[in-house]
Amino acid sequence: MSEPKEKVLQMFKEHKIGTLATIRQNKPFSRFMLFFHDGLTLYTATNKDTHKAEDIENNPSVHVLLGFNGDAWKNDYAEIEGSASVEESAELKEKFWNGELKEWISGPDDPNYLLLKITPKSIRYYQKAGSE
């Protein structure tokens, strides 16, 4: 495995909260989300009755920022440009279920539980602000 890929995977493992940007009415909309990963593929959960679900249905292009934890500008982070789709697999919904989601979704069997799969088109990894 290449060193940059290893660094990105390690960062994905350490940083679960990031921003997800979608497009609505030709404008970007960002929100904080809880992310999980399988290799370089990202997953995030939402309620099916949200604007982001509608945004992705209309335009699957998304942008994710992961890595920054508020400690000045010294942290590694990544910008991920990708395509989002709905993941229907009950097995993956169970695998990526997290109790922190209970505020929005009652459990992995909740019919409103929508698991979004983000397939990267490009990943830019920064070791600190201003580097690439």
Predicted region positions:
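Short Pro/Gly-enriched beta-strand edge/turn motifs at strand-loop
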Residues: E14-T19, F96-E100
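Short, structured beta-strand-loop surface elements
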Residues: K52-P120
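Short hydrophobic-aromatic micro-motifs
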Residues: L42-A45, I80, L116-I118, Y125
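Extreme N-terminal tail/first-helix region
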Residues: M1-G18
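Short polybasic amphipathic segments
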Residues: L20, I123-Y125
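A generic local structural motif
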Residues: P4-K7, F29-R31, D49-H51, E103
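Flexible glycine-rich active-site/ligand-binding loops centered on an Asp-His dyad
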Residues: P120, G130-E132
